[in-house]
Amino acid sequence: MRGKETTSFLLAGWYVALLVPTLVFKYTYLTAVSGNLSTQLTLLATSGTDLPAWWVHVRHIVPADFLDVLWLLAGLWLVGRVLLKIPLVALACGSVLTLLVVGGAHMIAVREIGATLTLDNVRITRDWIAEHPDLVRQFLTARRLAWLLAALTWTATPVLFAAACRRLHARHPGASRAVPVATTLVLSYSLVFGAAAAFGSSRSAVSRGFWTSIVSSALSSDASNPDRASIPSESELLTAYERVAFPRGQAEASYVVDIPPSRRVPRHVVIFTLETAPLQYYPLTDNPQLPAFHAMSAHALVSAEHYASAPVTNLAMYSLVTGTYPPPGSPIIRYRFKTDGLADVLSGHGYETSFIESYDLHWNGPLDERLLRDLGFPTIRDAVQMAGRRQTEWDDYRIGLETRAFDEALQHVVGAARRSRKAFVCVQTDLGHFDWLHPPDRRVASAPDRIAYTAKILDTLFERFLNGLAENGLADEVLIIVIGDHGLRFKMEFESLAAPVQYGDLVFNVPFIAYAPGLFPLQVRLPFPTSHVDIAPTVLDLLGIRRQGNLYLGTNMLDQRLADRIVFLPSASFTGLYPADSFRWKDQIYSLHRIVDRVTVQNAHASASASLANRPHLPFSEMDVKRIVSAAKAVFEDTAAYFRRRFTQAPGGSASRE
């Protein structure tokens, strides 16, 4: 009898040791994605009811976690104890430690990006840390080490709980009956309330068990399916997109300025993407402290209302080149495709096309290069390949790589000109990546000062590039796009700037300059929001190249109809990223928060948001926002499927680029 009692005490302690951190993880996660725990969770779970807060938690939020832990313990017992014959104490303590490690890793991900881990972002994180091991030291703070020590101590909970129960039983033998009674109550609660919460709630994302959510997230690799039996035609895709993107329909085309056809001729095109460049910290336009950018802005199309199409570099580049939103699903595009992107179209007009990465293109494996091949770039270089591995101080090395990338871009343009051809070059800069550069005269500088120093370094590189063009007689023969790929993404970036982690301008609003002295004798400032998807059609129109018959979801940025168009800001559409999808229409940004099924709205460029239910005077209701987000995602998925079919079933044979 004593052995059975000891086992029951140990099982009870094991369950408690698994349940408590699970609930901590669950509430930490929901707090991160919903806001204030004491008010938001209760409203989200049973909006519009008068139920007491404690009942909302007991009935809707935690039951599925009791059930998750019950199934977890049962599975561990069956596999570890029955099949593998692992000693119960070792199995219990080892599983608790494993749970704490796995849950802690997910909490770090939630803290940094607002989402749990997926296989993709585990691989990305692993590869990035391998390239930047210094990041590990930044995470090993005294607070985190204290939490690690607490976790190690907690692993002994099953043993300590069983020992405490034995002592209690020795003093009060009748107390042992409490264990089976409590077990029966927990089992009943888990099966009845847990199943109802997880499967019977319309808000199952909140009610679902934490570990169920983790498994679902980890197995989510690519939510979209580009291989479909039925794929809309190009005209059907455009019609569907216009229906969702232009809520009031489209008027006749009119333009901010009219550029005569005599000036819309082929020019050398260079696109520079600035890594992690929120407009708030990269005010490039009309900034006298950045003389090169200031001079460029005087003869350019500029905007303070430009938005990235995704908070990921490779997806942002996809949109810039193709003129379409990136496909929902994994942020790593694994399938092959063929688009009407700039590299393909300009190659067909005699351009020499190339892509230059200012770091190491292969740090995350071969898929980034394959993506660029499918985007139509036959020539791909990276600065590490050209300059070699690090041999100097880290910041000097980064600046050296950037300088090498700019010089290589200049050589491509000059070389094409000498062959009486035009060049299309994309330069993906890396200098703005966190951890920010340190000014050499101030090793202890604030994060804004460090970003300002980065902008000044970039300004000198652009001055060097422009001088090189002028020396070769090409100063007026270029169209240069300077654009941020995306804004901030990780909590460490926000914290370094003493900024709250908010899904909005700091993530998506980026600088934009389209410098072309042969096209813009004066500055042209756009008053309405634009997107990365507008770059490709705008470039083609400015070069006088017809784009009829090609599929673009973007529009010429000079077209005033864009004032009535929705600009989409997707994130939850991509697995492992912040769980909200937004769009801007007019002066409002509407956000659908996936996990908590809540719609918020905020004024463009404002930080505070409010529930859309509290703004009944606005043109969109919660149902409208959900419908728009869902319809847009469907269009983006269908567009990806259309491009996939082009690759595998091109007229007359395979469209393979290999």
What label would you give each PLM region?
Residues 57-63, 329-333, 393-397, 448-452, ...:
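Active-site rim elements
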Residues 188-271, 276-443, 453, 543, ...:
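Active-site-proximal alpha/beta segments of enzymes that process anionic O-linked groups
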Residues 447, 470, 474-477, 481-520:
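Histidine-centered active-site microenvironments of extracellular/periplasmic hydrolases
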